[in-house]
Design a protein with these regions (language model features):
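Cysteine-centered motifs
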Residues: 3-6
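N-terminal export leaders
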Residues: 16-20
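Hydrophobic helical h-region of N-terminal Sec-dependent signal peptides
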Residues: 23-28
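Low-complexity, Ser/Thr/Pro/Gly-enriched N-terminal "stalk/linker" regions
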Residues: 34-96, 122-123, 127-144, 180-187, ...
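Terminal, non-catalytic domain-edge segments
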Residues: 35-51, 177-178, 278, 284-435
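Carbohydrate-binding/catalytic loop surfaces
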Residues: 58-89, 137-157, 205-225, 263-290, ...
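Non-membrane alpha-helical segments in proteins
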Residues: 90-110, 123, 146, 150, ...
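Elongated scaffolding segments in large macromolecular assemblies
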Residues: 179-328
Length: 435
């Protein structure tokens, strides 16, 4: 018996001798990996602020490795060159990108509590307010500004305006905003929302175009955008009418399956105009996350959580696209976007502007193949990564975290022309916030 006990003790010591190094090794690997991911996110942050945030606090679409880019002149903006939508110009997506990126900026400040990070979030907020102050058209949200800090393209869009609402709401409730800033933001939100409602939930545009895009409809994106706008306005103003509109809207039915908007939210993101479009749908998922955060009804909150989980699972399918990116790629990006003016012609309607833009883009990608690669293998999987991290279900998030981390560490940000890797930082801040 005594011998048996001795043998057991020896085995225990041997197991410990082997197990302890294994545990220590696993711990070291995990920590090294965490450091690698954190460093990649910090590099993305540094590169974004070095090259892509303009003097007015607005994120531009692209720049060279020194942060230089030729902006559209005021005359080109007025004439709609290369097109009145500003598609493939360097000031195409300022409202969209600023509004989305605010999520990362606020989460970064909450993590660091650094005054410098609060000021960065404030600068983005000021850029968003500027984009709502550059036109005589009430409720207009611009895409970006020209060299004079005011001139702009005549049309924004629903893709620009929802992130504008989302970003300002996120800043308003962050803890950074002063009382004066909160009041100013509320004024802009109310004025813009009221005008959109007056136009039947269409986005205001300048003459001769009238409007561009809508929050009305029964696609997930439209449903989430409209509900979020109502709920956010109620949160910011306390006005009962917005909550009443919100509750009525939830019950409305329509679409191919005659689902209620509540049910559509529960189903989550759906791709419908191409195989994947995480980069345009992510704002609607961000809006759903905002609805989940603001909702006090337990049953409704649970349904929003299901929608976020479904969205995360769908988005995760695009994460492997990041591995198709080649950091050594040297294909032409073509900084001179004005080559598109070869196809330019005057536009007087939204349809004419979009048709022109599509012709221009098709030709442009032939001389600028790098642009297509960055959008396919950087923009799409990084936006998907952020969508995954918006899910409040820890089990779902844990299952996809390794793949999200692979996306974050995939790129050499100093060699990218497009700013559309900013979702990398957004995803990491949410992972860090969860941990």
């Amino acid at each position: 018996m005594r011998c048996s006990r001795c043998q057991g003790a020896v085995l225990l010591l041997m197991n410990r001798r082997f197990l302890l190094p294994l545990v220590a090794s696993a711990w070291l690997v995990a920590n090294l990996r965490a450091d690698e991911v954190a460093q990649a996110a910090e590099k993305a942050h540094s590169e974004l602020w070095r090259r892509f945030i303009d003097a007015y606090g607005i994120m531009i679409d692209f720049a060279d490795m020194d942060g230089k880019v030729s902006l559209p002149t005021p005359e080109e903006c007025r004439e709609g060159k290369p097109n009145a939508l500003g598609w493939r110009a360097p000031i195409e997506n300022g409202a969209m990108f600023n509004g989305l990126y605010m999520d990362s900026s606020v989460n970064r400040w909450k993590r660091t509590q650094a005054a410098a990070d609060a000021e960065k979030a404030r600068k983005l907020m000021q850029g968003l307010l500027l984009l709502n102050s550059i036109s005589d058209v009430k409720g207009f949200v611009g895409r970006g500004v020209s060299t004079d800090g005011k001139s702009h393209y005549a049309m924004g869009s629903n893709d620009q305006t929802l992130p504008w609402f989302l970003g300002l709401w996120r800043y308003w409730q962050s803890g950074i905003a002063t009382n004066a800033e909160k009041a100013k933001i509320a004024q802009h939100l109310v004025t813009t929302a009221e005008e959109i409602v007056r136009l039947g939930w269409k986005m205001p545009a300048e003459p001769p175009f009238g409007t561009r895009g809508s929050f009305e409809g029964f696609h997930f994106e439209e449903v989430s955008r409209k509900l979020f706008t109502m709920k956010a306005l109620h949160a910011v103003t306390g006005a009962a009418k917005w909550q009443s509109m919100y509750l009525d809207e939830l019950a409305k039915r329509g679409g191919e399956k005659n689902l209620s908007k509540r049910e559509i939210c529960e189903g989550g993101m759906v791709f419908w105009y191409s195989k994947t479009h995480n980069w345009t749908s992510c704002a609607a998922v961000g809006a759903l996350r905002g609805l989940w955060e603001m909702e006090s009804d337990a049953a409704l909150k649970a349904e929003f959580a299901k929608g976020l989980a479904a969205s995360a699972k769908l988005a995760a399918e695009a994460l492997p696209l990041a591995q198709q990116w080649d950091n050594a790629d040297t294909s032409p990006f073509e900084m001179n976007w004005r080559v598109m003016n070869a196809d330019w012609k005057p536009q007087t309607t939204e349809k004419e502007a979009q048709e022109l833009a599509m012709v221009q883009i098709k030709s442009f990608l032939k001389v600028a193949p790098r642009r297509g690669k960055e959008t396919a293998f950087i923009r799409e999987p990084t936006a998907a990564a952020w969508i995954v991290t918006l899910c409040p279900d820890a089990t779902v998030l844990k299952a996809h975290t390794p793949e999200v981390e692979k996306v974050i560490t995939r790129y050499d940000f100093t060699k990218l022309y497009y700013s559309q890797f900013f979702w990398v930082e957004m995803a990491w801040e949410r992972l860090k916030n969860r941990s």
